[in-house]
């Protein structure tokens, strides 16, 4: 399993090494790794080939768990090395990277994204679609083709995906053009956004206004 943190680090740990417990909250993840002050886990990913393929394999209509897992494993084996992830910081910079880069790390982890100043990683996502939707906290949204996002094989900042002025990235979602996203505002109310309602543009733009008065706090 891979843990992605706000400091641009990734920690890859074998599941059978995790402490086992029948009850309680388990052991704090900070005890497993050498986190810096203020570093938090912002996302995690199972690296089980069948789990990775789950979101990308068409349904066969077979309700057998064994059959489904075999289908997923076959899919993952056929696409070995081809699956990618995406990571984006609050500054609007981000990149794609091959999941084959995620190998077991030490307790100190490995630098995945280079951050400047007080910038923090907003999120990580497995790439399961061809369009990327991003929203800034001041109410602007943009949709760009995933293939415009730089592919890096090592640590870096990536490219500017959205131009932010006096704001920061609230979140992002990857899907196909007919996909949608749910925005959460500072008053805890939500709003559904359809990708097809936003014109696809090139990376680096400011986007369009999708919320005039409310601050966006999360994107799902």
Indicate where each model-derived feature is located:
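Short, structured "edge-of-domain" segments at secondary-structure transitions
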Residues: 1-220
